[in-house]
From Swiss-Prot:
The modification N-acetylaspartate is found at D3. Gene3D superfamilies: 3.30.420.40, Actin, Chain A, domain 4. This is Actin CyI, cytoplasmic. The keyword Hydrolase applies. It comes from Heliocidaris erythrogramma (Sea urchin). Residues 1-2 form a propeptide. Pfam families: Actin. Its EC number is 3.6.4.-.
C-alpha cells in the first residue's frame, strides 16, 4: 500500500493538531494546528488577495489580524463548517490528493456522540465523494500501534484525556473515563505560575511561547514534595529559556509544578481524580478477570504524555493503588505523540481490514447510520 495513487488516507483530528498522511507510512506527512482563522477587519489593501478564512499554520502565522477558532473542543467536533474547511485543507493543500480517489480512515474520541459519527460519514461521502471510509476510536489505534489488542490506554492530547480499557480489540464503553484536563490546561497553568513570578504572558501569541517552554523544559517529578525542597535549597533544577525578543528567563520549580497538575488537578482548581487514580478507577470498572491484563498493559498515548518522568511516576502511583502482588507495567512508546495516527496507518494497510471499509454504495443504500453497524 505504499503506492500513493491508491493508498488509503489516515486523518487523526485532534483538539490541538491534525495529523494526516498515507496508510503504510510510519509517520504522518502533515501535522498542523486544528484552527480556522477569519479576518477581524475588512481588508484595506485592494488586490492583496485576502481570503475569507485561513487554516492551520497560515492561520497561526497571521493570528495578529485574525479571530482564531478551534472546531474541535475536548476531542469532539462542535463546528462542522469549520471542520469541513480543515478537511478540505488537509486533502487539497497538505496531502495534495483528490479525496474521491482514496479510501479515508478518520479517528474519533471515545464516547463520541452517535450523531457526530453520522455527520462525519455524511460529509466524507456527500461533500468529498470518498469511495470508502471508516471511523476508528483513537485509543484503540494507539493500542494497535504498541502491538497489543488488550490493555488500557491513557490518551492525553491538547483538549481532553481519556482512559480506555480495551479487550481483544474492542473498547469497553462502560469503563471509559473522560478527564477534561489536558495540554491546553497545563499551558494555561504554566502561564499563570510564570506570571506570579513576574513574567507577563497574556496574549494568544505569548501562549504559544509558553507552550514551547512546556514542551522543552517541563518534566514530572517522581516525588513532588522532595523535588520542591530540592528546588528551594539549590539552583540545580533551574533552566534558562530565551524569548523571541532575546530576553532570557529562568524557570525553576515551574518545570515540574505545571505537569504535577495531571496527578493533582486541585492545582488547577479542579475537583477531579488525577490521571493515576482515573486509570485505576477505569480498571476497577472492568470485569475482575481482565484486570490483571490491563494492569500489565497500561499504554500511554498523546502529546501530553511526552513529559520525561511520567511513566515512572505513573508506575509508582498505580502500584500504590493496586493489589500488593499485582504486576504493573506502564508502556510509553517513544513515538506516542503520533501513535493514534500510526495505529490508523497499520490498520488501514492490513489485508484483513479491506472488507471493513464502508463503501459509497453501502452508504447510498443505508445512509449515515451504516457507520454504527460497520465501525465499532
Amino acid at each position: 500500500m505504499c503506492d500513493d495513487d491508491v493508498a488509503a488516507l489516515v486523518i487523526d483530528n485532534g483538539s490541538g493538531m491534525v495529523k494526516a498522511g498515507f496508510a503504510g507510512d510510519d509517520a504522518p506527512r502533515a501535522v498542523f494546528p486544528s484552527i480556522v482563522g477569519r479576518p477581524r477587519h475588512q481588508g484595506v489593501m485592494v488586490g492583496m488577495g485576502q481570503k475569507d478564512s485561513y487554516v492551520g499554520d497560515e492561520a497561526q502565522s497571521k493570528r495578529g489580524i485574525l479571530t482564531l477558532k478551534y472546531p474541535i473542543e475536548h476531542g469532539i467536533v462542535t463546528n462542522w463548517d469549520d471542520m469541513e474547511k480543515i478537511w478540505h485543507h488537509t486533502f487539497y493543500n497538505e496531502l495534495r490528493v483528490a479525496p474521491e480517489e482514496h479510501p479515508v480512515l478518520l479517528t474519533e474520541a471515545p464516547l463520541n456522540p452517535k450523531a457526530n459519527r453520522e455527520k462525519m460519514t455524511q460529509i466524507m461521502f456527500e461533500t468529498f465523494n470518498s469511495p470508502a471510509m471508516y471511523v476508528a476510536i483513537q485509543a484503540v489505534l494507539s493500542l494497535y500501534a504498541s502491538g497489543r489488542t488488550t490493555g488500557i490506554v491513557f490518551d492525553s492530547g491538547d483538549g481532553v484525556s481519556h482512559t480506555v480499557p480495551i479487550y481483544e480489540g474492542y473498547a469497553l464503553p462502560h469503563a471509559i473515563l473522560r478527564l477534561d484536563l489536558a495540554g491546553r490546561d497545563l499551558t494555561d497553568y504554566l502561564m499563570k505560575i510564570l506570571t506570579e513570578r513576574g513574567y507577563s504572558f497574556t496574549t494568544t501569541a505569548e501562549r504559544e511561547i509558553v507552550r514551547d517552554i512546556k514542551e522543552k523544559l517541563c518534566y514530572v517529578a517522581l516525588d513532588f514534595e522532595q523535588e520542591m525542597s530540592t528546588a528551594a535549597s539549590s539552583s540545580s533544577l533551574e533552566k534558562s529559556y530565551e524569548l523571541p525578543d532575546g530576553q532570557v528567563i529562568t524557570i525553576g520549580n515551574e518545570r515540574f509544578r505545571a505537569p504535577e497538575s495531571l496527578f493533582q488537578p486541585s492545582f488547577l482548581g479542579m475537583e477531579s481524580a488525577g490521571i493515576h487514580e482515573t486509570t485505576y478507577n477505569s480498571i476497577m470498572k472492568c470485569d475482575v478477570d481482565i484486570r490483571k491484563d490491563l494492569y500489565a498493559n497500561t499504554v500511554l498515548s498523546g502529546g501530553s504524555t511526552m513529559f520525561p518522568g511520567i511513566a515512572d511516576r505513573m508506575q509508582k502511583e498505580i502500584t500504590a493503588l493496586a493489589p500488593p502482588t499485582m504486576k504493573i507495567k506502564i508502556i510509553a512508546p517513544p513515538e506516542r505523540k503520533y501513535s493514534v495516527w500510526i495505529g490508523g496507518s497499520i490498520l488501514a494497510s492490513l489485508s484483513t481490514f479491506q472488507q471493513m471499509w464502508i463503501s459509497k454504495q453501502e452508504y447510498d443504500e443505508s445512509g449515515p447510520s451504516i457507520v454504527h453497524r460497520k465501525c465499532f
